[in-house]
Amino acid sequence: MKKKVLIVGNGYVGGYVFAQLNSNTELDVTLESKATFDYTDEFYLRDYIKEQRFDYLINAQGFTGRPNVDQAEVEKEACWKYNVQVPLMFSRVCKDLDVQPIHITSGCIFTGYDKAWSEVDEPNYGVFNPDASFYSTSKHAFESVNDFGITIRIRMPFCDTLNDRSYITKIHKYDNLIQAVNSKTYIPDLVDFIELLVEEGRTGTDTVHFCNPEPLDTGGVIDLMRTFELENLNWKFVEFETLNCKANRSNCILDSTKVKEEYGFMLPNEEEAFKKALAAITA
């Protein structure tokens, strides 16, 4: 019998997840969004899941803000609703109905280069850090309370198209860049990993850092982009303070060795992933 998968959220990441999982003939996949039904209505969601008998719920919805996370400082109520209240409700409903949730969330709850942060480290850029952005605070708040599901932390996602939410697209269009090294996530790899979780029937509660290892700094990324003739002639490096952002930013490296050691999934390093993405974009 085919596994039934409900994907909630048809944005940047959710759309990618649906496209690949929907092509898997062993899966029966449904994509829902705010435009198709009110997934914030717990009673409706319960009835819907009972009726359809889903095995997995992939939480790909959330508040990120446009054009960036500064918007969370303005729309705090919406940010809290979609990053904290709704995911917690998903976990509660799934636990009651014996459905496995997979939460796609953010690793921006860490900051600093003291170490490569692992899943067992206590987040230092969230609820208990007064300098944290509200976006990071909301992500940490959810995780600090949530007690069910597989939580996948990603950072600065990029893909093999010029999607306006992709790190590559953002870097390409920005004139002013910050020189920093950060973990990043190649979305096609993430989708492969989620597909593996579903195919293998993974269940329970766990947290996984999913970022391509050996992260590049900003200069390394734009050097690769220039190699593929994807360049902005106005690029220049500036100090973060000159950008007049409403919120601080997380800068950190996440340790993603757990993906290989406990899940048997081989992640290419960041340079390989960027080359693959840029080759597809410029083909």
What residue spans do the PLM features occupy?
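N-terminal Rossmann NAD(P)H-binding glycine-rich loop of SDR-like oxidoreductase domains
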Residues: 4-22
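Adenosine-cofactor binding site in Rossmann-like domains, unifying the SAM/SAH pocket
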Residues: 29-48
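NAD(P)H-binding glycine-rich loop region in Rossmannoid oxidoreductase-like domains
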Residues: 42-84
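Catalytic helix-loop patch of NAD(P)-dependent Rossmann-fold dehydrogenases
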Residues: 74-81, 85-86, 109-152, 156-159
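NAD(P)-dependent short-chain dehydrogenase/reductase
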Residues: 132, 143-192, 196
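Substrate-binding strand-loop-helix patch
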Residues: 160, 180-191, 210-228, 276
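Mid/C-terminal beta-alpha module of Rossmann-like enzyme folds, strongest
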Residues: 196, 200-246, 250
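Conserved C-terminal active-site "lid" loop/helix of NAD(P)H-dependent oxidoreductases
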Residues: 217-223, 237-283
